[in-house]
From Swiss-Prot:
Heme b b562 binds at H84, H183. Its cofactor is heme b. Its main location: mitochondrion. Binds 2 heme b groups non-covalently. The lineage of its organism: Eukaryota, Metazoa, Chordata, Craniata, Vertebrata. Heme 1 (or BL or b562) is low-potential and absorbs at about 562 nm, and heme 2 (or BH or b566) is high-potential and absorbs at about 566 nm. It is a multi-pass membrane protein. SUPFAM superfamilies: a domain/subunit of cytochrome bc1 complex (Ubiquinol-cytochrome c reductase), Transmembrane di-heme cytochromes. It is found in: Mitochondrion inner membrane. This is Cytochrome b. It comes from Herpetotheres cachinnans. Keywords: Electron transport, Heme, Iron, Membrane, Metal-binding, Mitochondrion, Mitochondrion inner membrane, Respiratory chain, Transmembrane, Transmembrane helix, Transport, Ubiquinone.
Length: 380
């Protein structure tokens, strides 16, 4: 009998072991859909991005009008741009839900998978930031100026570093050119890191809602979960289509309809909604270097999750106290997001400071303590 090509061919074998015959826990819930949804998001963003890059000009005098030209004169250019801009928002929604799932179900105990995931998040944030600068609107320009300027808080080398990043003494043509180069390159780096992320995941196999070993129960990924992921994809692409077709500018900033002007500062400089929680943490500390460190810590704190796990149970499924804290953390992040969008005045300053404090306290102190307390209660 001839060997099955799907299982013997060097390339098809890899696809087969990752997407078809992959042994999967039978009880994984819809929260496990987000990995594949992120893959779909990445492919969508790369395709729409490539089409946009064909019509974009990375020059300060032409960038804004080239984007306008794409929307007005290119066949379906408006749709491609709207899908790309709103696809980024959907990408971040999926990423945050994916990370939330990892925190809730103790997936961070697969350390290599978790750490590559955080590196992926950082790369994604960098990609989104440099991409936001490209349309060269007011908020693009001032967002780039404010965020790159933060590097000047680094002692001794800060100012040199900023000028090196800018390619001059302010955000100008060289900055735009290099940001376009980076925005083109980084998604392919993300695709490469995704393969590493999956390689580490498939070494251990997926976690499941009970957090117990499920080797004896596993079922093939296809057709069970390929079909389930297809439903997830439909449920994700529908809001994207609705957003891109009916309210394409709902998540954008009105300032970006004005071409960049270094002489006029917008009244409220703020990033896209998916960075607002980190922006609120940055603003909550009156000292520049302190703010930058807090901003970095707000994301890098995820690296500590495996070491802060004190419970004898992996997931929070049967740990009501930890569940309460987890949802407290979610609410906390929503408050930070809201505060980040508000002007720097009373009462938003104090709310932001309190929310920043409780964010770090919950992750570093309360969750580990609660895990240890639950061990005691359960007589472990």
């Amino acid at each position: 009998m001839a060997p099955n090509l799907r299982k013997s061919h060097p390339l098809l074998k890899m696809v087969n072991n990752s997407l078809i015959d992959l042994p999967t826990p039978p009880n994984i819930s819809a929260w496990w859909n987000f990995g594949s949804l992120l893959g779909i998001c990445l492919i969508t963003q790369i395709l729409t991005g490539l089409l946009l890059a064909m019509h974009y000009t990375a020059d300060t005098t032409l960038a804004f009008s080239s984007v306008a030209h794409t929307c007005r004169n290119v066949q379906y250019g408006w749709l491609i741009r709207n899908l790309h801009a709103n696809g980024a928002s959907l990408f971040f929604i999926c990423v945050y839900l994916h990370i939330g799932r990892g925190l809730y179900y103790g997936s961070y105990l697969y350390k290599e998978t978790w750490n590559t995931g955080i590196i992926l998040l950082l790369t994604l944030m960098a990609t989104a930031f440099v991409g936001y600068v490209l349309p060269w609107g007011q908020m693009s320009f001032w967002g780039a100026t404010v965020i790159t300027n933060l590097f000047s808080a680094i002692p001794y080398i800060g100012q040199t570093l900023v000028e090196w990043a800018w390619g001059g003494f302010s955000v100008d043509n060289p900055t735009l050119t290099r940001f376009f180069a980076l925005h083109f390159l980084l998604p392919f780096l993300i695709a490469g890191l995704t393969l590493i992320h999956l390689t580490f995941l498939h070494e251990s196999g997926s976690n499941n809602p009970l957090g117990i070993v499920s080797n004896c129960d596993k079922i093939p990924f296809h057709p069970y979960f390929s079909l389930k992921d297809l439903l997830g994809a439909a449920l994700m692409l529908s809001p994207l289509a609705i957003l891109a077709l009916f309210t394409p500018n709902f998540l954008g900033d009105p300032e970006n309809f004005t071409p960049a002007n270094p002489l006029v500062t917008p009244p409220h400089i703020k990033p896209e909604w998916y960075f607002l929680f980190a922006y609120a943490i940055l603003r909550s500390i009156p000292n520049k270097l302190g703010g930058v460190l807090a901003l970095a810590a707000s994301v890098l704190i995820l690296f500590l999750s495996p070491f802060l796990h004190k419970s004898k149970q992996r997931t929070m499924t049967f740990r009501p106290l930890s569940q309460l804290l987890f949802w407290f953390l979610v609410a906390n992040l929503l408050i930070l997001t809201w505060v980040g969008s508000q002007p720097v005045e009373h009462p938003f300053i104090i709310i932001g400071q309190l929310a920043s404090f409780t964010y770090f306290t919950t992750l570093l102190v309360l969750l580990p303590l609660t895990g240890a307390l639950e061990n005691k209660i359960l007589n472990y």
